């Protein structure tokens, strides 16, 4: 890998850093919002395209998630190479255009294609935005910035169903996409004023194109295979092709990146033990977290017979707790204290999911006596863990690789999340006549996975002393 020549203007001011953080939080909000906002609109979409099989229409939901996870890693490398602000502005414009394409979709195929493109532009947007934040934020305040950024993304994922339900009931499913356009345009206007603080590689030093394509297709294949394996059949040709082919492409991209002077994957970052451990823990905890976030509203709907808006309101309890703990974790300066805060967060999540796997969460609704305290435990734990892991990963990155490093960290969490959701689907498929028992099993599995994450988070890792480039 060639040495990066970082072009910097004057040091960022506190005002510029705050403005950059607010813009990045807005971008995270809309990117993660669109992972979940369409779920509630799905029945309305299906009614508008009656001739399209349901199996095909599910790609309106999964197409975005697959493209998002597939492109996060190469997007981070591209942001560092092309310039983070440049890629961020282009991604915002692309997100607005693809949202409009989805809103105007005359056919299901058009809508699915629009969603895949929308997920791709979101993947370009997220690591470039976070890279801008890290470049504009003093090292001692990075934890607080990541805490705010994580809170915005987590809150979006939870309120997505409520917002989607309100838009569908008040207008039409197309409003779910239309609302992105003015929000994104406002972000473009604001982002154009971000100071040029981001690093750029020397002219022509773009990441290896072949390796970039390989890692994108490989991750996309793995996520698609894991996400759709239950529906396609785990031994079907489609699932095996996606999983085996995707795995081989990722391995090929890793081997090529280890030898290429401008690798598609920044494999050198994985030599940092704090960074590698943060990513491994993100992968494991992501599996438990995403399974819990999806099973929560399903439980409220199927077992306690809550309405869409009622379920969203109940889930907001955890989202608010997550925002509070993310803010608290971001203000902790000691690496040792942060590490134990991450362990505490994982154990809080374990306590929540163990509780939810018992008869306390039975057929009779128990909002105040069970759901609210469990939601505070689970959501609060997520806020601690996500912020601590994000700060640990960012703290191990040299400035010229901020976007590449955060992109891989987010990829680890998204791929782990896809695996967790696949486990959830497999449990429900195995117990179709016992939905309550299936939910209890899922919650127990979430607890076990989170316990593994707690053990990983507790491992002591010596943080290297900062160098002039780090």
Model-derived features: where do they sit?
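Intrinsic disorder in cytosolic terminal tails and internal cytosolic loops
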Residues: 1-17, 201, 459-470
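Transmembrane-helix bundle of Major Facilitator Superfamily
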Residues: 2-193, 342, 354-357, 371
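12-transmembrane solute porter fold
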Residues: 19-40, 237-242, 249, 261-464, ...
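Short helix-kink/termination motifs in transmembrane helices of multi-pass secondary transporters
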Residues: 30-41, 67-70, 84, 176, ...
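A residue-level signal for alpha-helical anchor/packing sites in multi-pass solute transporters
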Residues: 44-45, 132, 166, 256, ...
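Interfacial helix-cap and linker-helix signal at transmembrane-aqueous boundaries
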Residues: 45-46, 78-79, 163-171, 226, ...
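Glycine/proline-centered helix-kink
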Residues: 127, 148, 153-165, 219, ...
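Hydrophobic transmembrane-helix bundles of small-molecule transporters
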Residues: 169-284, 288, 295, 306-307, ...
């Amino acid at each position: 890998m060639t040495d990066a020549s970082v072009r910097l203007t004057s040091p960022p001011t506190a005002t510029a850093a705050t403005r950059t953080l607010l813009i990045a939080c807005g971008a995270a909000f809309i990117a993660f919002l669109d992972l979940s906002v369409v779920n509630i609109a799905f029945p309305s979409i299906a009614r508008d395209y009656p001739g399209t099989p349901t199996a095909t229409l599910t790609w309106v939901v999964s197409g975005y998630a697959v493209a998002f996870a597939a492109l996060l890693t190469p997007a981070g490398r591209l942001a560092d190479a092309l310039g983070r602000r440049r890629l961020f502005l282009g991604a915002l414009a692309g997100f607005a255009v693809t949202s409009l394409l989805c809103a105007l979709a005359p056919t299901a195929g058009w809508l699915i294609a629009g969603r895949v493109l929308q997920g791709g532009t979101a993947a370009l947007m997220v690591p470039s935005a976070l890279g801008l934040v890290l470049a504009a934020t003093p090292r001692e305040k990075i934890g607080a910035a990541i805490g705010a950024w994580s809170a915005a993304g987590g809150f979006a994922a939870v309120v997505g169903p409520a917002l989607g339900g309100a838009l569908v009931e008040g207008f039409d499913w197309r409003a779910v996409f239309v609302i992105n356009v003015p929000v994104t345009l406002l972000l473009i206007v604001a982002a154009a004023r971000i100071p040029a603080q981001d690093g750029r590689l020397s002219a022509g030093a773009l990441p290896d194109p072949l390796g970039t394509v390989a890692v994108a297709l490989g991750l996309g294949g793995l996520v698609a295979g894991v996400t759709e394996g239950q529906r396609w059949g785990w031994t079907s040709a489609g699932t095996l092709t996606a999983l085996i082919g995707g795995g081989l492409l990722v391995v090929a991209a890793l081997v090529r990146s280890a030898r290429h002077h401008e690798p598609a994957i920044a494999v050198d970052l994985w030599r940092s033990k704090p960074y590698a451990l943060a990513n491994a823990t993100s992968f494991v905890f992501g599996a438990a977290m995403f399974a819990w976030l999806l099973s929560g509203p399903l439980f409220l709907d199927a077992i306690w017979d809550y309405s869409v808006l009622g379920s969203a309101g109940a889930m907001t309890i955890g989202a608010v707790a997550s925002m509070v703990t993310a803010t608290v974790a971001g203000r902790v300066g000691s690496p040792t204290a942060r590490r134990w805060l991450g362990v505490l967060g994982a154990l809080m999540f374990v306590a929540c999911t163990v509780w939810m796997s018992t008869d306390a969460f039975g057929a009779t609704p128990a909002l105040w006596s069970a759901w609210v305290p469990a939601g505070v435990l689970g959501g609060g734990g997520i806020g601690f863990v996500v912020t601590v892991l994000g700060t640990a990963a960012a703290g191990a990155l040299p400035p010229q690789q901020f976007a590449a490093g955060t992109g891989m960290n987010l990829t680890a969490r998204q791929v782990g999340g896809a695996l967790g959701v696949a486990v959830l689907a497999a449990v429900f498929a195995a117990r179709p006549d016992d939905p309550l028992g299936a939910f209890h099993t899922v919650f127990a599995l979430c607890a076990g996975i989170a316990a593994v994450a707690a053990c990983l988070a507790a491992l002591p890792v010596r943080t290297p002393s900062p160098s002039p480039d780090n």
